[in-house]
Curated annotation (Swiss-Prot):
The lineage of its organism: Archaea, Methanobacteriati, Methanobacteriota, Methanomada group, Methanococci. It comes from the Archaea. It holds the Pfam family TatD_DNase. This is Uncharacterized protein MJ1383. GO terms for molecular function: hydrolase activity, acting on ester bonds. Keywords: Signal. Belongs to the metallo-dependent hydrolases superfamily. Residues 1-30 form the signal peptide.
Amino acid sequence: MIDTHIHSDTRGLEDLELMAMCLDGVITLAHDPFEMKNIKVWEAHVEKLLINELERAKKVGLNLFICVGMHPRAIPPEIDEALDKIKSYINYNSRVVGIGEIGLEKATKEEKEVFIKQLLLAEELNMPAVVHTPRRNKEEVTKIILDEISTLNLKNRDIVIEHCNKETTKWVLDEEFYVGLTIQPGKLTPLEAVEIVKEYKDFADKILLNSDCSSNASDVLAVPRTVLKMKINGIEKDVIYKVAHKNAVNLFGLDI
């Protein structure tokens, strides 16, 4: 099992150890731990993931991978400089497997510009992109995200639209992108995720599971708990294997 979206820098070692006991791997992503008043603050955050978090994960035996990028709530003023740094971070460490967490929060002009630049960078580098959708106005902003992507005519379709609900799942699958199901208080319950997987099991190749484990209320066992619920509810083994493991390995090229 792989948890495809966490923020390990917000959790204690005991949580990382618990994940290591249950999961084959996790992906931690850049996010918005504080206001990015300048490029140095953003660099410090990303470099903490690349150095400190890998060291912490190693201590407890957690197989940790990383995505780097500018979260829509954490955009530094020096956008182009940050894009260059993302390139260097990807070259710096093979544990960097994607660009994220990017996306839109309020769909402002600046957010859209930064989002598009990062999608184009993912295209240039042939890397997966992990796209945030907000809790508020999720449907409206998800439509904007899909519209923005459609204008770019990207060859790279390795894009995960995160925190999908039942309605947005259909839209994302219609566009042939990956659906990220987040099992977290305020997003999906394990049973709600099970119902989505059950309804769209014919598209199981395009579904991923995650906990979005962060400083918000979270369940570090969200993925194994959801896998258990899928087994109890009679979802086929091959479907479970795809959404809980295989798709993540294939999409991000994980060495697991």
